[in-house]
A protein has these predicted regions:
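N-terminal transmembrane alpha-helices
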Residues: 5-43, 56-71, 75, 100-107, ...
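Transmembrane alpha-helix boundary and packing residues in multipass membrane permease domains
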Residues: 21, 25, 37, 74, ...
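Small-residue-rich hydrophobic transmembrane alpha-helices
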Residues: 48-108, 145-164, 271-335, 368-390
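Short runs within selected transmembrane alpha-helices of multi-pass transporters and secretion channels
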Residues: 69, 137-156, 164-172, 193-208, ...
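Transmembrane helical elements of multi-pass membrane transporters/channels
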Residues: 16-35, 137, 171, 200-204, ...
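Short alpha-helical transmembrane segments in multi-pass integral membrane proteins
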Residues: 1-18, 76-141, 185-241, 297-364, ...
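Helix-terminus/linker motif at the lipid-water interface of multi-pass membrane proteins
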Residues: 30-48, 118-125, 181-188, 248-281, ...
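Residue-level hotspots within the lipid-embedded alpha helices of multi-pass solute transporters
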Residues: 25-29, 63, 103, 107, ...
Length: 457
């Protein structure tokens, strides 16, 4: 199921590649929502707040590992696009070793420092123990998350977005079933929700490995491929570390928002958690577009077809903009019917807070789409620093607004923290993309002139 994105209509290729990713991401968010619904309705609002309070911490830890594994496989996509199969296999072997190291380090660090981090975040005392229980189990299962993210990223690097979809559907169904069994019948509370998550992730990772072994000989590696060659590692870390830091910088911003939010009480935290679940669901096409553009641009960067990269980015922005407008109106209308799915108490109050959040953030969906497109396009082209700086812009904007909101004890201010981050980072990355594209064009022209001069000698 390989897909060569260096030939054919960019818009058609993007559409073909993105649809399975969107479906997979939506399934992933749906099982996350079901997770929240079951916790909220069968354990209570405090438990819902406890799980919601871990969202930014999970993003910090798992986002860092995801950034690394995704960054490691950008080189795989570039070598696939260039037709260098042996170099591609070496990049896979190197990525596997680096991912094992990352897993060990991140598991130890996250579990060791979690108590202090939750205290710094002003986690309410009435939900502290449940919050810690949930996130510690998630951290213990980092290996499951890394296994799936690495293998699915490798498959996407060669243009296969269908199999990761199938595996996500399987994982989603497994997670929902385990949620219900462990929470409703096993009476395991938030711990049951956490165990359901890591078990389903581990299953999808194992199934992904089995599929590659049985059906994708192109990706089969031998012992000699599993070496940390200096140039290969340098190339992978050049993209992987900035991607990981970009995730972490963004996550730190969300932690600042969560800290401001925690000052407003567990009911507001629960309301914000519901709002974020809805937002994360409807913004999955933006994230899917980002993954698509990383693969599309990496493959075309492998053959240095810059004009084709431009056309793809333009098509992606048009699709993203149209979707942003449509989904904002849809969510605004449907929200009063969605919120009661999550909770059975304090419905009117939670719905009011949720509507405020969606109303404010929904107006900034277009720059959010720009962030995913330009950031991933640049990363696919091998640039790590500017996308990371986009994360810094997000952090500064989100942090300043969150600080002001905490000082004023303002929920509306907290909602504007995310919106301001999307707007400022979207503009920054738009400028960075055009600047670096011009740089690549100049470098290509110089290279072609040198090649021509050499041929004439």
């Amino acid at each position: 199921m390989e897909l060569d994105m260096t030939k054919g209509s960019p818009a058609k290729l993007i559409t073909k590649f993105i649809i399975p990713i969107i479906i997979g991401n939506i399934f992933q968010q749906l099982y996350s929502m079901v997770d929240t619904i079951i916790v909220g309705r069968f354990v209570g609002v405090d438990a819902l707040a406890a799980v919601g309070a871990t969202g930014s911490v999970s993003f910090l830890i798992l986002g860092f590992t995801q950034g690394l594994t995704t960054g490691f496989t950008v080189l795989t996509a570039q070598r696939f696009g260039a037709g260098d199969r042996e170099g591609m296999r070496k990049s896979i072997g190197s990525a596997a070793i680096l991912s094992v190291i990352v897993t060990i380090v991140m598991t130890a660090v996250s579990m060791g420092g979690m108590d202090s981090l939750l205290r710094v975040m002003n986690t309410p005392e009435d939900i502290f123990d449940m919050t810690k229980e949930y996130i510690m189990i998630i951290c213990a299962g980092i290996a499951c998350n890394v296994l799936y993210n690495l293998l699915s990223s490798i498959l996407r690097a060669i243009g296969n977005s269908v199999v990761p979809l199938v595996l996500l559907v399987i994982a989603s169904v497994t997670n929902i079933v385990l949620d219900y069994v462990l929470i409703v019948y096993g009476h395991m509370g938030v711990g049951g929700a956490a165990y359901a998550t890591i078990i389903s992730q581990g299953l999808s990772g194992v199934l992904c490995l089995i599929y590659i072994i049985k059906s994708v000989p192109t990706l089969h590696i031998r012992p000699e491929h599993c070496r940390l060659e200096s140039q290969c590692v340098k190339n992978q870390l050049t993209v992987g570390i900035p991607m990981a830091l970009q995730f972490s910088i963004t996550a730190i911003g969300t932690i600042l928002v969560q800290a401001a939010l925690n000052l407003l009480g567990s009911t507001v935290v629960a309301s914000y958690s519901v709002s974020c679940k809805v937002e994360q669901l409807v913004t999955q096409p933006f994230a899917a577009m980002g993954v698509t553009m990383a693969t599309y641009c990496a493959q075309n960067r492998g053959i240095n077809d810059l004009d084709r990269i431009r056309k793809g980015v333009k098509a992606a922005n048009i699709m993203s903009g149209v979707y942003a407008v449509l989904v904002y109106g849809l969510v605004y209308i449907a929200l009063p019917y969605i919120v009661p799915l999550f909770i059975s108490e304090q419905v009117e109050m939670v719905c009011g807070y949720a509507r405020t959040y969606i109303t404010i953030c929904g107006m900034f969906f277009i720059p959010l789409g720009m962030i995913f497109i330009f950031r991933n396009a640049l990363q696919g082209c091998g640039f790590g620093f500017m996308p990371m700086m986009g994360g810094v812009v997000e952090l500064l904007s989100r942090g300043i607004v969150a600080f002001a909101a905490a000082h004023l004890m303002s929920y509306v201010g907290v909602c504007f923290a995310n919106a301001s981050a999307w707007l400022t980072a979207g503009i920054f990355l738009w400028i960075a993309y055009h600047f670096l594209m011009k740089k690549m064009v100049r470098e290509k022209k110089v290279h072609e002139e040198r090649m021509l001069a050499g041929a004439m000698q």
